[in-house]
């Protein structure tokens, strides 16, 4: 996994996770994260993109005929925030952020607000 920090404002995003090379059984990945995020937004974005990495590795997120599929269903017909792989990533991001804050910082977080980091501007 390579993590790249760069400006993603033009992409209306705080982060992306992409495979490098072939989409068949991908094992090399790049995670791009918006430069200069607040620390909590950076952590949430990284966790969100790591959920996507897990989806690729487990094979629940795939590319078929140039279209992204989640659990064998094309996601292209869904609006961004209704895409099932994004719904899962946002839900997991919240859980993982809670665990991180409790275990690393000793700060319980009851209901962290999701950052809605990827392509949110386009979805709204």
Identify the residue ranges that each predicted region occupies.
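Active-site hotspot residues in diverse enzymes, especially metal/ion-binding acidic/histidine motifs
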Residues: 1-8, 16
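Membrane-embedded and juxtamembrane structural elements of multi-pass membrane proteins
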Residues: 10-12, 23-24, 28-33, 53, ...
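Active-site recognition of the HExxH zinc-binding catalytic motif
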Residues: 44-57, 89
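Short, solvent-exposed loop/turn segments at secondary-structure junctions
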Residues: 8-9, 37-38, 98
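Short pre-active-site segment immediately N-terminal to the catalytic Zn-binding motif
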Residues: 29-46
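Post-HEXXH active-site segment of zinc metalloproteases
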Residues: 40, 56-87
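Substrate-binding/catalytic groove segments of enzymes
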Residues: 54-67, 98-108
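Long, well-structured alpha-helical subdomains associated
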Residues: 79-83, 93-124
């Amino acid at each position: 996994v390579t993590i790249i920090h760069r400006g993603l404002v033009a992409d209306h995003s705080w982060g992306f996770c992409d495979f490098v090379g072939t989409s068949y059984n991908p094992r090399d990945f790049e995670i791009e994260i918006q430069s200069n995020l607040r620390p909590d937004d950076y952590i949430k974005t990284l966790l969100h993109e790591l959920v996507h990495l897990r989806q690729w590795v487990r094979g629940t997120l795939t590319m078929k005929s140039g279209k992204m599929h989640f659990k064998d269903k094309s996601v292209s017909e869904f609006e961004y925030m209704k895409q099932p792989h994004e719904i899962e990533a946002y839900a997991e991001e919240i859980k993982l952020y809670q665990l991180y804050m409790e275990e690393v910082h000793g700060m319980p977080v009851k209901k962290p607000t999701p950052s809605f980091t990827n392509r949110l501007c386009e979805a709204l």
